[in-house]
Amino acid sequence: MRPLTARQTEVLELIKTTMQETGMPPTRAEIARQLGFRSANAAEEHLKALARKGVIEILPGTSRGIKLNIPLDNEAEEEEGLPLIGRVAAGEPILAQEHVESHYKVDPALFQPQADFLLRVNGMSMKDIGILDGDLLAVHRTTDVHNGQVVVARVDEDVTVKRLEKRGREVLLHAENEEFSPIKVDLANEPFAIEGIAVGVIRNADWM
């Protein structure tokens, strides 16, 4: 890793401290306020420099989209809370370490059954039941699922959140938005796996 400037080190330490204390990275505005930058844009430039040096990864689409590529000073603290899963690589276990963006200090027992991880929602296919783009979906890891449940399913190379309907050797994954057609899966010919069931939603704005 290339050496960091004094300012870059300050930004990195603030990111690490914030993640240890809150379970999530700071926003650009929070970085600017804490370190006395004139604007969030100045914080963004320092984040880009850290990303170029391989210390962090910038995740698009969220104000807290910062992933550390180095361990926190207190690894035990880092592991507290529910892991937040971002993009899932094809063929990789959903809870593989490289998929974990951060950890959120949420009591898993708040959900019934207990949540095992959080999944960042992309898109509005489930909006009619209140699962919106950018939300964090609490998921209980299980393969024991029934018709009508909202599941996290892996279809070939994609992970999707849909309502399950099993029909013999075929599965239908229904959206809760009339603009989306059901996904049909031929179990005899298409890779398919259940990763878990949805047990709750955290509105992403509540964490911003």
Swiss-Prot record:
<dbReference type="InterPro" id="IPR039418">
    <property type="entry name" value="LexA-like"/>
</dbReference>
<dbReference type="GO" id="GO:0006508">
    <property type="term" value="P:proteolysis"/>
</dbReference>
<feature type="active site" description="For autocatalytic cleavage activity">
    <location>
        <position position="125"/>
    </location>
</feature>
<dbReference type="GO" id="GO:0006281">
    <property type="term" value="P:DNA repair"/>
</dbReference>
<dbReference type="Pfam" id="PF00717">
    <property type="entry name" value="Peptidase_S24"/>
</dbReference>
<dbReference type="GO" id="GO:0003677">
    <property type="term" value="F:DNA binding"/>
</dbReference>
<comment type="function">
    <text>Represses a number of genes involved in the response to DNA damage (SOS response), including recA and lexA. In the presence of single-stranded DNA, RecA interacts with LexA causing an autocatalytic cleavage which disrupts the DNA-binding part of LexA, leading to derepression of the SOS regulon and eventually DNA repair.</text>
</comment>
<keyword id="KW-0234">DNA repair</keyword>
<dbReference type="InterPro" id="IPR050077">
    <property type="entry name" value="LexA_repressor"/>
</dbReference>
<keyword id="KW-0678">Repressor</keyword>
<keyword id="KW-0235">DNA replication</keyword>
<dbReference type="GO" id="GO:0006260">
    <property type="term" value="P:DNA replication"/>
</dbReference>
<comment type="similarity">
    <text>Belongs to the peptidase S24 family.</text>
</comment>
<dbReference type="GO" id="GO:0045892">
    <property type="term" value="P:negative regulation of DNA-templated transcription"/>
</dbReference>
<keyword id="KW-0378">Hydrolase</keyword>
<dbReference type="InterPro" id="IPR036286">
    <property type="entry name" value="LexA/Signal_pep-like_sf"/>
</dbReference>
<keyword id="KW-0238">DNA-binding</keyword>
<dbReference type="InterPro" id="IPR015927">
    <property type="entry name" value="Peptidase_S24_S26A/B/C"/>
</dbReference>
<dbReference type="InterPro" id="IPR036388">
    <property type="entry name" value="WH-like_DNA-bd_sf"/>
</dbReference>
<comment type="subunit">
    <text>Homodimer.</text>
</comment>
<keyword id="KW-0805">Transcription regulation</keyword>
<feature type="active site" description="For autocatalytic cleavage activity">
    <location>
        <position position="162"/>
    </location>
</feature>
<dbReference type="InterPro" id="IPR036390">
    <property type="entry name" value="WH_DNA-bd_sf"/>
</dbReference>
<keyword id="KW-0227">DNA damage</keyword>
<keyword id="KW-0742">SOS response</keyword>
<dbReference type="Pfam" id="PF01726">
    <property type="entry name" value="LexA_DNA_bind"/>
</dbReference>
<feature type="site" description="Cleavage; by autolysis">
    <location>
        <begin position="90"/>
        <end position="91"/>
    </location>
</feature>
<dbReference type="InterPro" id="IPR006200">
    <property type="entry name" value="LexA"/>
</dbReference>
<keyword id="KW-0804">Transcription</keyword>
<keyword id="KW-0068">Autocatalytic cleavage</keyword>
<dbReference type="InterPro" id="IPR006199">
    <property type="entry name" value="LexA_DNA-bd_dom"/>
</dbReference>
<dbReference type="GO" id="GO:0009432">
    <property type="term" value="P:SOS response"/>
</dbReference>
<dbReference type="GO" id="GO:0004252">
    <property type="term" value="F:serine-type endopeptidase activity"/>
</dbReference>
<feature type="DNA-binding region" description="H-T-H motif">
    <location>
        <begin position="28"/>
        <end position="48"/>
    </location>
</feature>
<protein>
    <recommendedName>
        <fullName>LexA repressor</fullName>
        <ecNumber>3.4.21.88</ecNumber>
    </recommendedName>
</protein>
<dbReference type="InterPro" id="IPR006197">
    <property type="entry name" value="Peptidase_S24_LexA"/>
</dbReference>
